[in-house]
From Swiss-Prot:
Gene name as annotated: rhmD
Family: Belongs to the mandelate racemase/muconate lactonizing enzyme family. RhamD subfamily.
Name the record gives this protein: L-rhamnonate dehydratase
EC number assigned by the record: 4.2.1.90
Keyword Lyase: yes
Lineage of the species this protein comes from: Bacteria, Pseudomonadati, Pseudomonadota, Betaproteobacteria, Burkholderiales
Species of origin: Verminephrobacter eiseniae (strain EF01-2)
Matches recorded under Pfam families: MR_MLE_C, MR_MLE_N
Annotated SMART domains: MR_MLE
Amino acid sequence: MGMPFIKHVRAFTVRGGGADYHDQGGGHWIDDHIATPMSKYPEYRQSRQSFGINVLGTLVVEIEASDGTVGFSVTTGGDLGCFIVEKHLARFLEGARVTDIEKMWDQMYSATLYYGRKGIVINTISGVDLALWDLLAKIRKEPVHALLGGPVRDELIFYATGARPDLARQMGFIGGKMPLHHAPAEREEGLAKNLDMIGDMRSKVGKDFWLMLDCWMSLDVEYATRLATAARNEHGLKWIEEALSPDDYWGYAELRRNVPRGMLVTTGEHEATRWGFRLLLEMGCCDIIQPDVGWCGGITELIKISNLADAHGKLVVPHGSSVYSYHFVITRQNSPFAEFLMMAPKADEVVPMFNPQLLDEPVPVNGRIKASALDAPGFGVRLNPDIALHRPYPRQAA
């Protein structure tokens, strides 16, 4: 019996946390005076939700095969992503063999070049691609990582992103990455507060625990150089992440030349496709690239990005993304550790990143996840049936 074909594609929106992890209630650390490109405007400085960071919502993509198997994924994209899936991308999927993932990716990308390339369109293509890998692996009754060549290590080790690296150390993580709170618009006083925060956290975690700083595209080269130099020399900061606009490749190259020896410059969370990462790598912009598999083009594109980085001798440490990253990282020698996003409001406990949208999502125990915890078919997670799905652009089955 041959491989089934794709029978139908469906796209839904969901509100409230999950894949759009910024869509949280009040009092969550992830929305507490964090430096952003909008920090130059005082009225948008205190809360990231104030400028609309959570407007997209979650995109859920379901792909049903002719044998009844359903693959799915979640990413950011919301109503806009649903429109792109149902009105444009579905034509390249329905009727295709489930194994033709490379061809489907190329058709989706090529057909959207005139309005896509990055942003919401690549987010959406990423979501479709992840659902295709989930579907194929379920049909083959294998985990996605088996389709990618299998594990190269027995467990994943994690650093934690959140407001409390001191608690992350107690939970067994290898390091902690904090959000930057004050942007250049807050002048010297803000810079001093940033350095005080890093110094205070260093005193709590000790000298051997990794401390990193997530700047979320909020700085300029001069400020980032001053911050990185002082934080490295005074407090042993391991890396400075996404300090500049993702479009400023020249600035990243300059920043990397400027920082102290041993200080790492990392970026790539908001970069997309092999062509974007080619610029980062060839221009010497960073030491570690951090593609988000739900935003950079999916697994199909992340394979190419990772191979490109490997040829340049650079590490790939994907941004967040839970199981969608785990199944990839466990198969790659140049991805020696992974990120875990602390989604508890106070960053004081380990909870699933995509809660409440996904069920059976594994979480680190003592900062680790065994490879065997990823052995269920597909990505090993289920969509929570209690979540209210909305399909804004329904179609008849092909």
